[in-house]
Regions:
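Ferredoxin-like alpha/beta domains used as RNA- or RNAP-binding modules
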Residues: 1-102, 129-207
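Mid-length scaffold segments of soluble, non-membrane domains
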Residues: 101-104, 108-120
Length: 207
Protein backbone atom coordinates (compact mmCIF):
# COMPACT_ATOMS: atom_id res chain seq x y z
CA UNK A 1 0.00 0.00 0.00
CA UNK A 2 1.36 3.42 -0.98
CA UNK A 3 1.62 5.95 1.81
CA UNK A 4 -1.02 8.62 1.26
CA UNK A 5 0.27 12.13 0.65
CA UNK A 6 -1.62 13.62 3.60
CA UNK A 7 0.22 11.22 5.93
CA UNK A 8 3.46 13.00 5.06
CA UNK A 9 1.89 16.41 5.70
CA UNK A 10 0.57 15.17 9.04
CA UNK A 11 4.04 14.09 10.14
CA UNK A 12 5.62 17.33 8.94
CA UNK A 13 3.04 19.30 10.92
CA UNK A 14 3.95 17.35 14.07
CA UNK A 15 7.68 17.44 13.32
CA UNK A 16 7.74 13.70 13.96
CA UNK A 17 7.69 10.50 11.94
CA UNK A 18 4.88 8.18 13.03
CA UNK A 19 5.91 4.57 12.30
CA UNK A 20 2.34 3.32 12.01
CA UNK A 21 1.86 5.36 8.86
CA UNK A 22 4.48 3.30 7.07
CA UNK A 23 7.28 4.52 4.84
CA UNK A 24 9.92 6.66 6.52
CA UNK A 25 11.28 9.89 5.11
CA UNK A 26 8.44 12.33 5.80
CA UNK A 27 10.88 14.84 7.31
CA UNK A 28 13.97 14.10 5.24
CA UNK A 29 13.49 16.85 2.65
CA UNK A 30 11.25 19.38 4.41
CA UNK A 31 11.54 19.05 8.20
CA UNK A 32 9.09 21.86 8.90
CA UNK A 33 5.28 22.17 8.88
CA UNK A 34 3.35 22.67 5.63
CA UNK A 35 3.00 26.39 4.89
CA UNK A 36 6.21 27.29 6.71
CA UNK A 37 9.76 27.54 5.43
CA UNK A 38 13.20 27.17 6.96
CA UNK A 39 14.11 25.30 10.11
CA UNK A 40 12.41 27.49 12.72
CA UNK A 41 9.32 25.85 14.12
CA UNK A 42 6.43 27.94 15.37
CA UNK A 43 6.12 28.30 19.15
CA UNK A 44 3.00 26.65 20.51
CA UNK A 45 0.76 27.44 23.46
CA UNK A 46 0.46 25.00 26.37
CA UNK A 47 -2.91 23.89 25.02
CA UNK A 48 -1.45 23.27 21.56
CA UNK A 49 1.34 21.16 23.05
CA UNK A 50 -1.17 19.03 24.96
CA UNK A 51 -3.32 18.70 21.86
CA UNK A 52 -0.29 17.59 19.86
CA UNK A 53 0.29 14.61 22.16
CA UNK A 54 -3.29 13.52 21.64
CA UNK A 55 -2.91 13.89 17.88
CA UNK A 56 0.20 11.71 17.87
CA UNK A 57 -1.72 8.77 19.33
CA UNK A 58 -4.80 9.28 17.22
CA UNK A 59 -2.88 9.61 13.96
CA UNK A 60 -0.29 6.87 14.48
CA UNK A 61 -2.95 4.28 15.32
CA UNK A 62 -5.33 5.70 12.66
CA UNK A 63 -8.21 6.37 15.06
CA UNK A 64 -11.14 8.72 14.88
CA UNK A 65 -11.71 11.01 17.86
CA UNK A 66 -14.68 8.87 18.85
CA UNK A 67 -12.63 5.65 18.74
CA UNK A 68 -9.86 7.17 20.86
CA UNK A 69 -12.36 8.39 23.45
CA UNK A 70 -13.89 4.92 23.66
CA UNK A 71 -10.45 3.42 24.33
CA UNK A 72 -9.85 6.06 26.99
CA UNK A 73 -13.16 5.28 28.73
CA UNK A 74 -12.37 1.56 28.74
CA UNK A 75 -8.88 2.24 30.10
CA UNK A 76 -10.17 4.48 32.89
CA UNK A 77 -12.71 1.83 33.87
CA UNK A 78 -10.11 -0.94 33.99
CA UNK A 79 -7.21 0.92 35.62
CA UNK A 80 -8.33 4.38 36.82
CA UNK A 81 -5.07 5.06 38.68
CA UNK A 82 -2.88 4.30 35.66
CA UNK A 83 -5.23 4.67 32.75
CA UNK A 84 -2.70 6.14 30.30
CA UNK A 85 -0.51 3.03 30.59
CA UNK A 86 -3.62 0.88 30.17
CA UNK A 87 -4.55 2.92 27.09
CA UNK A 88 -1.09 2.39 25.59
CA UNK A 89 -1.41 -1.35 26.24
CA UNK A 90 -4.80 -1.52 24.52
CA UNK A 91 -3.66 0.50 21.51
CA UNK A 92 -0.52 -1.59 21.06
CA UNK A 93 -2.64 -4.76 21.27
CA UNK A 94 -5.15 -3.69 18.64
CA UNK A 95 -5.08 -6.44 16.04
CA UNK A 96 -4.11 -4.12 13.19
CA UNK A 97 -1.17 -2.80 15.22
CA UNK A 98 -0.04 -6.28 16.29
CA UNK A 99 -0.09 -7.41 12.66
CA UNK A 100 2.05 -4.36 11.78
CA UNK A 101 4.44 -4.83 14.71
CA UNK A 102 4.96 -8.48 13.79
CA UNK A 103 6.12 -7.35 10.36
CA UNK A 104 3.18 -8.95 8.56
CA UNK A 105 2.42 -5.55 6.97
CA UNK A 106 4.49 -2.40 6.27
CA UNK A 107 2.02 -0.03 7.96
CA UNK A 108 -1.10 -0.01 10.11
CA UNK A 109 -3.36 0.93 7.16
CA UNK A 110 -1.94 -2.05 5.23
CA UNK A 111 -2.40 -4.29 8.28
CA UNK A 112 -5.99 -3.10 8.58
CA UNK A 113 -6.68 -4.21 5.02
CA UNK A 114 -5.28 -7.67 5.75
CA UNK A 115 -7.53 -7.95 8.80
CA UNK A 116 -10.69 -6.69 7.08
CA UNK A 117 -10.12 -9.04 4.12
CA UNK A 118 -10.00 -12.04 6.45
CA UNK A 119 -6.30 -12.89 6.08
CA UNK A 120 -5.52 -12.90 9.82
CA UNK A 121 -6.09 -15.70 12.33
CA UNK A 122 -6.16 -15.37 16.11
CA UNK A 123 -5.69 -18.73 17.84
CA UNK A 124 -6.46 -20.35 14.49
CA UNK A 125 -9.76 -18.54 13.95
CA UNK A 126 -10.41 -15.73 11.48
CA UNK A 127 -10.82 -12.30 13.05
CA UNK A 128 -11.70 -9.47 10.68
CA UNK A 129 -12.14 -6.66 13.22
CA UNK A 130 -9.15 -4.31 13.31
CA UNK A 131 -10.03 -2.95 16.76
CA UNK A 132 -10.00 -6.43 18.32
CA UNK A 133 -7.69 -6.26 21.35
CA UNK A 134 -5.36 -9.27 21.45
CA UNK A 135 -4.93 -10.89 24.85
CA UNK A 136 -1.75 -12.18 26.44
CA UNK A 137 -0.67 -15.60 25.09
CA UNK A 138 -2.93 -15.39 22.04
CA UNK A 139 -1.39 -16.42 18.72
CA UNK A 140 -1.60 -14.38 15.52
CA UNK A 141 -0.95 -15.98 12.16
CA UNK A 142 -1.61 -15.52 8.45
CA UNK A 143 -3.87 -17.59 6.24
CA UNK A 144 -1.91 -19.61 3.69
CA UNK A 145 -3.04 -17.50 0.73
CA UNK A 146 -1.89 -14.34 2.50
CA UNK A 147 1.73 -15.49 2.28
CA UNK A 148 1.62 -14.66 -1.44
CA UNK A 149 0.20 -11.20 -0.81
CA UNK A 150 2.57 -8.40 -1.86
CA UNK A 151 1.72 -6.37 1.24
CA UNK A 152 2.72 -9.29 3.46
CA UNK A 153 5.91 -9.96 1.52
CA UNK A 154 6.85 -6.29 1.75
CA UNK A 155 6.31 -6.26 5.51
CA UNK A 156 8.23 -9.48 6.13
CA UNK A 157 11.17 -8.51 3.93
CA UNK A 158 11.56 -5.00 5.34
CA UNK A 159 9.71 -4.45 8.63
CA UNK A 160 9.23 -0.80 9.59
CA UNK A 161 10.19 -1.45 13.24
CA UNK A 162 12.14 -4.00 15.25
CA UNK A 163 10.05 -6.64 17.01
CA UNK A 164 9.03 -5.28 20.45
CA UNK A 165 9.80 -7.39 23.51
CA UNK A 166 6.15 -8.00 24.31
CA UNK A 167 5.87 -10.04 21.11
CA UNK A 168 7.72 -13.09 19.91
CA UNK A 169 7.70 -15.11 16.71
CA UNK A 170 7.75 -18.89 16.45
CA UNK A 171 7.79 -21.41 13.63
CA UNK A 172 4.74 -23.60 14.09
CA UNK A 173 4.06 -26.36 11.57
CA UNK A 174 6.08 -24.47 8.98
CA UNK A 175 4.26 -21.18 9.58
CA UNK A 176 5.34 -17.99 11.30
CA UNK A 177 3.20 -17.36 14.37
CA UNK A 178 3.26 -14.24 16.50
CA UNK A 179 2.50 -14.45 20.22
CA UNK A 180 1.72 -11.69 22.73
CA UNK A 181 4.03 -12.87 25.50
CA UNK A 182 3.56 -9.86 27.82
CA UNK A 183 1.33 -6.83 28.19
CA UNK A 184 2.82 -3.71 26.58
CA UNK A 185 2.81 -0.28 28.20
CA UNK A 186 3.78 3.32 27.64
CA UNK A 187 7.40 2.37 26.97
CA UNK A 188 6.31 0.49 23.85
CA UNK A 189 4.76 3.46 22.06
CA UNK A 190 7.18 3.71 19.09
CA UNK A 191 7.64 7.49 19.07
CA UNK A 192 8.35 10.25 21.62
CA UNK A 193 5.21 10.70 23.72
CA UNK A 194 4.61 12.89 26.78
CA UNK A 195 2.03 11.06 28.89
CA UNK A 196 1.86 14.01 31.30
CA UNK A 197 0.73 16.46 28.62
CA UNK A 198 -1.72 13.89 27.28
CA UNK A 199 -3.21 13.41 30.75
CA UNK A 200 -3.50 17.17 31.20
CA UNK A 201 -5.38 17.43 27.90
CA UNK A 202 -8.09 15.07 29.15
CA UNK A 203 -8.04 16.23 32.79
CA UNK A 204 -10.77 18.80 32.18
CA UNK A 205 -12.57 16.78 29.53
CA UNK A 206 -15.06 13.98 29.83
CA UNK A 207 -13.87 11.17 27.56
Amino acid sequence: MAVKRHYFKTQRRLGLELPGLGKSGALSRRPYPPGESGNKRKKYSDYALRLEEKQKLRLNYILTERQLRRFIRDSKTGQPANWVNSLASRLERRLDNVVFRLGFAPSIPAARQLVSHGHILVDGKKVDISSFVVKKDQEISLKDKALKNQTVLQGLQKPRLDLPDYLRKEDKDGKVVGIVQALPGLEHIPFPFDAGLFTEYYAARKA
